[in-house]
């Protein structure tokens, strides 16, 4: 096998491989000889089939197998001999010729690929980060405990008009220009006035109603509403009030805690505190991680593989356009041209790829590994995020090993960050919750999870639709 480098520019490589016809002929003869004693053909005694007859019957199929074996094995061995790590799977171009299958021509093919850049890892001691730590006010815990226990609150039927805080039972039918729309109807819907469960203007118009009332209200869907066909549109809802309930006094005690599955109020407060600490701790870590990545970004500047950059940019660009589409907005609405947005996200893609390569190199150098238990935990966390679909999600991961492997990269990255935190200077700083939550320029485009379909009148509670919410009843 003759191996010739035909291109070596930057990270790009092209290798020409020629397997002489005589080498192919030798491999074919070996396979035919091996088959001769095993094949059973009518008219011939075992082991007595003439070579010419075997070649006529099996020659081309055997040669095709030989060529496939070469294509499978050669790239790996060539890259190993050259001590190169390809950024992506090499592209193989084959010189197709019928004579090759007949063993009368050399087998020529080429490899085209980009190599990963050689990265010299620098010292980390100069990196300094501020770790913001916020004490959790007791009032935050009190408020969250009240929210958790609000689901245990009892309501009593009332005769008078509804007030904010009351619960009403209603039937409703939504219409656009007089025509009912999908997801815009429900029967026996329970709505607590003032909960902001529905879109702005809906609940407010139900203050003052009584059981038996029928009314039509007009509302406008928010411009950034998740359902694009409803965003910014005026709608009317025909509403029938079936009952009005006043809230009973909310009891904050051990008995209430037991109703939500905990043995005591103290245990509930402990769980709530842990959840809030986890939430703020995650925010603290993200800010620290951002500082580390900024420092690494300033320390490293090297050529990156165009193939990786193209994939990263396309992923970002697809998500950006999907987000705009869901919000019913355009680049002009965001105050930027599409061309300018492309430039900005191209820079972001470069940063992501470069930092990914740096973190990967650091991890390999210091021996960071992701074990099977960590992968299993990541799978279970994914499953947990889709209540009611646990079996389907678990089956997906069982049948799709590459999906499990995709969870390895973020775990690996976080373990590298853990390593770096032990090497750099970290200064803790006490801050208020408001200071901790203060927004800063995002480096990464947030990951979005697929969302289940929801009722058209339910207000979107966050910038990203949660996949955990249950689907609404259909009209």
Swiss-Prot record:
GO terms for cellular component: cytoplasm. It is found in: Cytoplasm. It comes from the Bacteria. GO terms for molecular function: peptidyl-prolyl cis-trans isomerase activity; protein folding chaperone; ribosome binding. Its EC number is 5.2.1.8. Keywords: Cell cycle, Cell division, Chaperone, Cytoplasm, Isomerase, Rotamase. Its main location: cytoplasm. Residues 165-250 form the PPIase FKBP-type domain. Gene3D superfamilies: 3.10.50.40, Trigger factor ribosome-binding domain, Trigger factor, C-terminal domain. Residues 439-466 have a biased composition (Basic and acidic residues). SUPFAM superfamilies: FKBP-like (SSF54534), Triger factor/SurA peptide-binding domain-like (SSF109998), Trigger factor ribosome-binding domain (SSF102735). InterPro entries: PPIase_dom_sf, PPIase_FKBP_dom, Trig_fac, Trigger_fac_C, Trigger_fac_C_sf, Trigger_fac_ribosome-bd_bac, Trigger_fac_ribosome-bd_sf, Trigger_fact/SurA_dom_sf. PROSITE patterns: FKBP_PPIASE (PS50059). One of its GO terms (biological process) is protein unfolding. It catalyses: [protein]-peptidylproline (omega=180) = [protein]-peptidylproline (omega=0). Residues 439-475 are annotated as: Disordered. PANTHER family: TRIGGER FACTOR CHAPERONE AND PEPTIDYL-PROLYL CIS/TRANS ISOMERASE, TRIGGER FACTOR-LIKE PROTEIN TIG, CHLOROPLASTIC. Consists of 3 domains; the N-terminus binds the ribosome, the middle domain has PPIase activity, while the C-terminus has intrinsic chaperone activity on its own. Involved in protein export. Acts as a chaperone by maintaining the newly synthesized protein in an open conformation. Functions as a peptidyl-prolyl cis-trans isomerase. NCBIfam families: tig (TIGR00115). Belongs to the FKBP-type PPIase family. Tig subfamily. This is Trigger factor. The gene is tig.
